[in-house]
Amino acid sequence: MTAATLFTPSITPQFDKASIDIDVNHHDKTTDIEQMLYDDVDDRNDDFMDEQADNILADTQSLTESVHFRKLQKKLRRQVSWAIRDFNMIEDGDVVMVCVSGGKDSYTLLDILLLLKRIAPIHFDIVAVNLDQKQPGYPEEVLPAYLNEQGIAHYILEKDTYSIVKSVVPEGKTYCSACSRLRRGSLYGFAKQIGATKIALGHHRDDMLATFFLNLFHGGALKSMPPKLLSDDKQNMLIRPLAYVEEKDIIEYSNLKEFPIIPCNLCGSQTNLQRAIINDMLREWDDAHPQRLASIFKAMQNVAPSQLADRELFDFETLSLDRDDNERLFEGDNIQAGQIESLAEIGLPVSPETQIFNPDFANAEKGSRAPKKIPTINPVI
């Protein structure tokens, strides 16, 4: 059973997606009618999940009685569900190891995944894992107390990566890269040790955008954090279920839930972090142009290799003309030729003809399914 099943209720819908022979992962290939049918199924599946979630929340405390909170939780649950479905993140029988740092993102991820586990018609297990990196002043009792109070199965790993990072990173350089590599290596090994099939990280949409611009501005590469990643040794699968979620929604959700947040003193003690500068830029854009970040994130899912300059992604060398034998004249009023002798020397016409509108070519183009677009030069987003 795949991730798509996670969002298909165990009821017989009026419309069966499988009966239409089109690719559900590429909605731009569908007709308007087909898309309406898909949207109808997705809406009814979401409604089913909403009903299950409402039943669960009916017995909870006053916090969930807030209409605003429940709307926000529904929004996050749907966005996480869509990300899991779109990238086939969680399948039946998976053991999902949720990495919990004590920050707002990982708390929110764990909370939403636990809700989905209760209402999904497939079975998957969740285990929370925290890596205590022995940073000075780290309140090591906070996370275990919270996880025990919530009845969440968990492991607390202790490894002094802090001392290693401090010893190998030169003074004045940022710790983030070295810290991340050490942490990732430890979590990879432990996931394999306990048999976890997926490692869930709390990176959200804005993290992915910030990483995109960090690589663009400082790494000379068009790349970001993928929603799903197979490790280089093919031993572990990373997933980012918050890929569609905005940070401001996570902040609000975390505040409403009153998670016991643990700040990262190692990161917070550093100044002039490039990621912090990028995050400030993104926030300014979002304030001034509310749809800009959504447009950029959409662009990350709509890559056109032929319109870039990466020779590995697109074969520019073997591009060749494929013209027909029909002579097509310039449709205009006049053509003025200059340096006629030079034109003649290279075999070009010295007095090319013009023509008025040619209905034959117009009729031929009507059969083309390619949309007619007005060319845009240097569009401003």
From Swiss-Prot:
Reactions that this protein is recorded to catalyse: cytidine(32) in tRNA + S-sulfanyl-L-cysteinyl-[cysteine desulfurase] + AH2 + ATP = 2-thiocytidine(32) in tRNA + L-cysteinyl-[cysteine desulfurase] + A + AMP + diphosphate + H(+)
UniProt keyword list: 4Fe-4S, ATP-binding, Cytoplasm, Iron, Iron-sulfur, Magnesium, Metal-binding, Nucleotide-binding, RNA-binding, Transferase, tRNA processing, tRNA-binding
Localization per record: Cytoplasm
Enzyme class: transferase
GO molecular function, one term: tRNA binding
Residue ranges annotated as motif PP-loop motif: 101-106
One Pfam family recorded for the sequence: ATP_bind_3
Comment on bound cofactor: Binds 1 [4Fe-4S] cluster per subunit. The cluster is chelated by three Cys residues, the fourth Fe has a free coordination site that may bind a sulfur atom transferred from the persulfide of IscS.
GO biological process: tRNA thio-modification
Pathway: tRNA modification
Protein EC: 2.8.1.-
Cofactor(s) required, per the database record: Mg(2+); [4Fe-4S] cluster
InterPro entries registered for this protein in UniProt: Rossmann-like_a/b/a_fold, TilS/TtcA_N, tRNA_Cyd_32_2_STrfase
Predominant subcellular localization, coarse grouping: cytoplasm
TM region(s), chain numbering: none
UniProt keyword Glycoprotein, yes or no: no
Coiled coil: none
Binding site residues for [4Fe-4S] cluster: 176, 179, 267
Entry GO CC: cytoplasm
HAMAP family in the cross-refs: TtcA
Homology family: Belongs to the TtcA family.
Its biological purpose: Catalyzes the ATP-dependent 2-thiolation of cytidine in position 32 of tRNA, to form 2-thiocytidine (s(2)C32). The sulfur atoms are provided by the cysteine/cysteine desulfurase (IscS) system.
Complexes and interactors: Homodimer.
Misc: The thiolation reaction likely consists of two steps: a first activation step by ATP to form an adenylated intermediate of the target base of tRNA, and a second nucleophilic substitution step of the sulfur (S) atom supplied by the hydrosulfide attached to the Fe-S cluster.
Protein name as annotated: tRNA-cytidine(32) 2-sulfurtransferase
Organism: Psychrobacter cryohalolentis (strain ATCC BAA-1226 / DSM 17306 / VKM B-2378 / K5)
